[in-house]
Amino acid sequence: MKHAHLIVPRTLVAGSASGELLYAPTGLSFWGGVDPRSAEVIDRHHPLSGRHLHGRLLAIPGGRGSCTGSSVLLELILGGRAPAAILLREPDEILALGAIVAEELFGRSLPIACLGERFDELAAYPWARLADGRLELHRDAPPPLEARPAEALATDAGPRLDAFDQALLAGEHGEAARLAMRIVLRMAALQGAQRLIDIQRAHIDACIYTGPAGLRFAETLRDLGARVRVPTTLNAISVDQRRWREQGVPAALGEPAAALARAYLDMGAQPSFTCAPYLLDDSARAGEQIVWAESNAVLFANSVLGARTNKYADFMDICCALTGRAPLAGCHLDEQRQARVLIEVEDLGSVDDAFYPTLGYLCGLLCDGQIPAIDGLRQRQPDHDALKAFGAALGTSSSVPMFHVIGVTPEAPDLASAFGGRAPRRTLRVGRERLRDAWRELDSAGETRIDLVALGNPHFSASEFAQLAALCHGRRRHPEVALVITSSRQVVAQAEAAGHLATLQAFGARLVTDTCWCMLDEPLVPPGARTLMTNSAKYAHYAPGLVGRQVRFAGLAGCVEAAVGGRSPAGLPAWLSEDC
């Protein structure tokens, strides 16, 4: 065997592995990007699309997109389909958390290591061996690993604990709280947090059903007597809890998905069932220290509301809710909320509402995991719906927990405030050419015939219902096109009280509550549908992998026209046309 190329990485989760190295220069969201049953990469925009992760050492710069990646990784580990190891450029708390939960609750291990600036060296090697805190890169298959006892978990490093923390860790508040505290402390050590803080509220994303492992996790905690210590809301779940049977959802999904929701309700969470908790009457407030999972909600809370939350992984969300404590790290700290990248947006003149998700998706691709500040939108003064669409798109194509829009968002009245008085590390300029490229990535179908219009990802707001009702008033959808909107029970009730539901029902629209498009499949996605249309950049990115359909992308008015006429316009919108 030839001499190996040696790297000493930072160990995030201990363990050993040897085998084929699967390298990509692009971050990967495990949720929506990896099938939890087969371990196939299903993100059709990713360079590893179609490859299988099982048994390979996966090398990616980091995660991106969904907080549910930790849940998918747990499914892979407990189902015996996980990668042999994960090698990262930068620490990824979502992936690390999935492996930590596997160790703490189920005694299963998956090594994760961080290589920093040396990550790109992996591109030249097809084989790797991780053992004894060292990574060997090989041109040929390395020797097999020798059997060895499991590595002991470090328990001495971590934050300072107060008396309450110590009582939780000692089991004085129950076994569920003790297990939750162990997980919180392991993540705090990984983050380098010096202490824990009290939190005011939590939003749980782990209620999305990804398979039996996530249900087993929740029911284990519930059966140990788990109870949340702070007001806790639930994300959109995987089914419409009240109507999944009449909607024709198979019991094989409906029953465990409903059971997962019940487990979190039994722990004291509220039945909010929304991926847009910022639309609830009692939402987070500026300056509050909160623990929110669900990527779009995290971005909105930090950026628009001015609350303080990290991009919490599934499972970490409920662990913090059960203890009422979170590591003082990341976006809980002033300095970690400052922008690092400046993105200057050229004046494009008149645009439609599709501008904001297109721009958000592009900014996520450009910012390289660093918090961006967007300059050039002050005169447009985007409203909350526009910022919601922008943030959801940004959170899909990147791992960032927040953004600033100069002159619009609360912590960015000017450039100096957004950057904490420092100069940007990078400055990028965005014009029509780059936006056209992003649009074409989202508007990926060649077909113009539309079978389904999918709205409400993230969940529709009351103002979006009003806009849609105005566009649909006095009209009827094409008989061969379904138009389906997902939203929360609370917002649907507001839309009904305002008279918008009657207008939409006369148009032929269908409403689904409790769940969202990223969790829906057949029959709510019609089995015969080949091409869907959406105004959501998030769903346009994920749908080809999640439901195997072609996707057209447009603003809300374009979606309504497609629902009426049965076809989408070919080519670019006017504000992106080559003639501008």
From Swiss-Prot:
pH-dependence of activity, as noted: Optimum pH is 8-9.5.
Recorded superkingdom: Bacteria
Cofactor(s) required for function per UniProt: Fe(3+)
UniProt-listed SUPFAM superfamilies: Aconitase iron-sulfur domain (SSF53732), LeuD/IlvD-like (SSF52016)
EC number of the protein: 4.2.1.171
Induction annotation: Expression is induced when the bacterium is grown on trans-4-hydroxy-L-proline (t4LHyp), and to a lesser extent when grown on cis-3-hydroxy-L-proline (c3LHyp) and cis-4-hydroxy-D-proline (c4DHyp) as sole carbon source. Expression is up-regulated by c3LHyp, and by several isomeric 3- and 4-hydroxyprolines.
Pfam family, one: AcnX_swivel_put
Effect on the protein of changing residue 303 to A: Loss of catalytic activity
Keyword terms, alphabetized: Iron, Lyase
Record annotation: effect of changing residue 294 to A: Loss of catalytic activity. Loss of iron
Temperature behavior of the protein's activity: No loss of activity after three months at minus 35 degrees Celsius.
Activity regulation info: Inhibited by Zn(2+), Cd(2+) and Hg(2+), but not by Co(2+), Ni(2+), Mn(2+), Sr(2+), Mg(2+), or Fe(3+). Inhibited by pyrrole-2-carboxylate and its derivative 2-thiophenecarboxylate, but not by trans-aconitate, fluorocitrate and oxalomalate, which are typical inhibitors of the aconitase enzymes.
Phenotypic consequence of residue 295 to A: Loss of catalytic activity
Recorded consequence of changing residue 70 to A: Loss of catalytic activity
Outcome following mutation: residue 538 to A: Loss of catalytic activity
GO terms under biological process: 4-hydroxyproline catabolic process
One Gene Ontology molecular-function label: lyase activity
Enzyme class, broadest EC rank: lyase
Active-site residues (renumbered): 66
Outcome of substituting residue 518 to A: Loss of catalytic activity. Contains iron
Subunit structure: Monomer.
Job of this protein: Catalyzes the dehydration of cis-3-hydroxy-L-proline (c3LHyp) to Delta(1)-pyrroline-2-carboxylate (Pyr2C). Also has activity with (2S,3S,4R)-3,4-dihydroxyproline as substrate, albeit at about 300-fold lower rate. No activity with L-proline, trans-4-hydroxy-L-proline (t4LHyp), cis-4-hydroxy-L-proline (c4LHyp), trans-3-hydroxy-L-proline (t3LHyp), D-proline, cis-4-hydroxy-D-proline (c4DHyp), trans-4-hydroxy-D-proline (t4DHyp) or L-serine as substrates. No hydro-lyase activity with citrate or cis-acotinate. Does not catalyze 2-epimerization of c3LHyp to trans-3-hydroxy-D-proline (t3DHyp).
Family to which this protein belongs: Belongs to the AcnX family.
Protein name: Cis-3-hydroxy-L-proline dehydratase
Naturally occurring in which organism (per UniProt): Pseudomonas aeruginosa (strain ATCC 15692 / DSM 22644 / CIP 104116 / JCM 14847 / LMG 12228 / 1C / PRS 101 / PAO1)
Gene: lhpI
